[in-house]
């Protein structure tokens, strides 16, 4: 009788390398964060709302809010300033606005300063030192070029901010006029929609000069030999409103320099006192599509919430939140 060959040894299970994490394949639908500002018509933050008072709709479909809190925290912001050989008064306005913003900063805020003309210039990387911010602004003395390539500068800024986690803000001090950017309006709008957790607060400069020229019918140029009409500025104003609306910010158009401290006080209040909502979308597709958002403030019965003051009178309020976001796209 022939001997049976010995049974093969049992297959050893692969050994787990120490320190290496276990992996599993799953579809992870990222949380969508929505910062919401609810204020009275006078700009006062309404701080008494609860989680159940908020209703979030994505493409018209109600979402379940999983995370909710009220924040009063330090900010991470970029001060993006137009500084070019345009009009002397525009430059003065831009500097006054920039210093007003610097004055509004608090101890633990992180701020970077970028100026732009033909191209962006990083004057100060992110810092918590106010003196560094003032030092960066003190460099703005003699502008180099007449061009104001706003779209290129804003795109570059958003590209840098996209690498930073958490909520970020762009304080955009500008006339809003773009002269010769390589990018067009559609491209910068697409970039704004695709950049997560960024809110833009445009602050217009040069309004007094514009108003004077409209009244006295004087011609003016945006820089040396770059003719600009009132229609160009009106279009710029509309674009700044759009940048703010898309990201949940607000655009400001001061008529006088004396308004600037109050404007930056308002912006500081807006970005330090917000409701932070988060949800996992009912649409799990990671297809890179743009999803429209709508935030409502409701009562227990689902109807619009009525807010009353201490005297029992109805208070009109406004809700500020971004209009949408771009879903992640799976890597093929």
What are these regions (language model features)?
Residues 1-332:
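Scaffold/interface architecture of coatomer-like assemblies
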């Amino acid at each position: 009788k022939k001997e049976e060959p010995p049974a093969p040894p049992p297959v050893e299970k692969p050994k787990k390398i120490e320190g290496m994490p276990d992996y599993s394949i799953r579809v992870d639908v990222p949380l969508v964060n929505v910062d919401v500002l609810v204020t009275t018509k006078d700009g006062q933050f309404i701080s008494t709302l609860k989680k159940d008072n908020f209703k979030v709709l994505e493409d018209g479909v109600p979402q379940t809010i999983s995370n909710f809190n009220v924040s009063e925290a330090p900010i991470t912001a970029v001060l993006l300033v137009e500084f070019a050989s345009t009009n002397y008064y525009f430059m003065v306005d831009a500097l006054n606005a920039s210093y007003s913003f610097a004055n509004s900063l608090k101890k633990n805020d992180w701020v970077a300063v970028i100026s732009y003309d033909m191209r962006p210039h990083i004057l100060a990387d992110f810092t918590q030192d106010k003196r560094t911010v003032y030092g960066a602004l003190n460099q703005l003395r003699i502008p180099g070029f007449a061009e104001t390539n706003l779209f290129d500068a804003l795109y570059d800024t958003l590209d840098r901010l996209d690498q930073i986690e958490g909520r970020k803000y762009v304080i955009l001090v500008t006339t809003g006029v773009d002269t010769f950017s390589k990018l067009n309006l559609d491209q910068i709008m697409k970039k704004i929609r695709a950049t997560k957790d960024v809110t833009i607060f445009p602050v217009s400069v040069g309004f007094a000069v514009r108003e004077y020229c409209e009244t006295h019918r004087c011609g003016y140029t945006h820089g040396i030999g770059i003719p600009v009409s009132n229609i160009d500025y009106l279009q710029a104003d509309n674009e700044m409103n759009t940048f703010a609306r898309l990201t949940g910010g607000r655009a400001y158009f001061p008529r006088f320099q004396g308004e600037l401290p109050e404007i930056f006080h308002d912006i500081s209040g807006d970005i330090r006192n917000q409701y932070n909502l988060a949800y996992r979308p009912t649409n799990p597709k990671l297809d890179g599509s743009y999803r429209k958002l709508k935030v409502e403030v409701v009562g227990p019965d689902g109807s619009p919430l009525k807010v009353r003051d201490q005297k029992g009178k109805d208070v009109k309020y406004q809700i500020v939140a971004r209009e949408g976001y771009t879903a992640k796209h799976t890597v093929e």
